[in-house]
UniProtKB/Swiss-Prot annotation:
Family: Belongs to the Turandot family.
Function summary: A humoral factor that may play a role in stress tolerance.
Keywords: Immunity, Innate immunity, Secreted, Signal
Cystine connections: none
One of the GO BP terms on file: cellular response to heat
One cellular component term from this protein's GO annotations in UniProt: extracellular space
Main location: secreted
Protein name: Protein Turandot Z
Domain of life, source organism: Eukaryota
InterPro entries assigned to the protein according to its UniProt record, in alphabetical order: Turandot
C-alpha cells in the first residue's frame, strides 16, 4: 500500500511537470505571435511580410488539430494557408528567384512599369497580412 501511494505521487509529479513544459512552449509561441503581430503592423515591406507570414504559419502548423479546436474555423484557415503557400513560394526564407530563367525574367521585369511592380508588392503585402491576421485571430482571440 505504501509503495502504491509513493508511486502515485511520483506519477502525479511527473504528469504536472510534463503539463507545465507544454504550457511554457505555448507561452513562448504566444509571446512570439504577439511580437510578430506588432512587426506585421509596423512593416509594409513585401519580403518582411512574407517572412512573418511563413513564421506565423509554422506556429499554426505546430498547434492545429489539437483537441478542442474549432474544426470549421480551422478548415477555413487551412484552406487560406494552403492557398497562400501555393501562391507564394519561399526558398530558404526568401521568395523564389526563378532558377534557370532568371535572366529572361529579369529582362521582362525591367520592362514592367514601376507602378505595376508597386501594385504587385502591395498585393503581396495585403495577402500576407490577411493570412497572418486570420492566424492571429485564431490564436489570440
Amino acid at each position: 500500500m505504501y509503495f502504491a501511494i509513493r508511486l502515485s505521487f511520483v506519477l502525479a509529479v511527473l504528469f504536472c511537470l510534463t503539463g507545465n513544459g507544454n504550457a511554457r512552449m505555448l507561452g513562448a509561441d504566444f509571446n512570439r505571435l504577439q511580437q510578430l503581430q506588432r512587426r506585421s503592423h509596423q512593416s509594409n515591406d513585401a519580403n518582411t511580410q512574407l517572412k512573418i507570414a511563413y513564421e506565423v504559419i509554422g506556429i499554426y502548423d505546430k498547434y492545429k488539430g489539437q483537441k478542442g479546436s474549432d474544426l470549421l474555423r480551422e478548415a477555413q484557415l487551412n484552406s487560406e494557408v494552403n492557398d497562400f503557400k501555393r501562391k507564394n513560394v519561399v526558398v530558404d526564407g526568401v521568395p523564389a528567384q526563378g532558377g534557370g530563367i532568371k535572366d529572361a525574367v529579369k529582362k521582362i521585369a525591367d520592362e514592367v512599369p514601376d507602378d505595376v511592380k508597386k501594385n504587385a508588392k502591395d498585393i503581396a503585402v495585403k495577402i500576407a497580412k490577411s493570412v497572418t491576421k486570420s492566424i492571429f485571430k485564431y490564436f489570440l482571440n
